From Swiss-Prot:
An example Gene Ontology molecular-function term: nucleic acid binding
InterPro entries (UniProt xref): Restrct_endonuc-II-like, tRNA_endonuc-like_dom_sf, UPF0102_YraN-like
NCBIfam families in the cross-refs: PRK12497.1-3, YraN family protein
Entry's family note: Belongs to the UPF0102 family.
Superkingdom per UniProt: Bacteria
Any one Pfam family match given in the protein's UniProt record, by short name: UPF0102
This protein's name: UPF0102 protein PERMA_0362
Gene3D superfamilies given in the database record: 3.40.1350.10
Organism of derivation: Persephonella marina (strain DSM 14350 / EX-H1)
Amino acid sequence: MFSWIKGKEGEDKAVEYLRNSGYRILERNFRSRFGEIDIIAEDNGTIVIVEVRSKGSTGYGYPEESIDHKKVRKIIKTAQFYLLKRDIKGKQVRFDIISIVNNNIFHIKNAFDLDY
């Protein structure tokens, strides 16, 4: 299966999970010259930037382990651009990771912050 198809399926599952958990989905696949954010949601007034990673097994590690410092910096820069472009001020921002292994969803809240 193509990795982008698998990635979209993982993102669809993550969106469903977030909605069922009471999050409001603001955007999906927000792109800028800095990078891409998989999901931007709102949770009780907090803007939540979500990176989704999925794998079929943990044989070669957990999905979230593939997010390196370079990827984190790209996510942060893209999030800053998003907030500026949408003129969002005065709201808390949180960076989460949703890791999916064999249809099991693990939600890692506050995975990193703007000072990373």
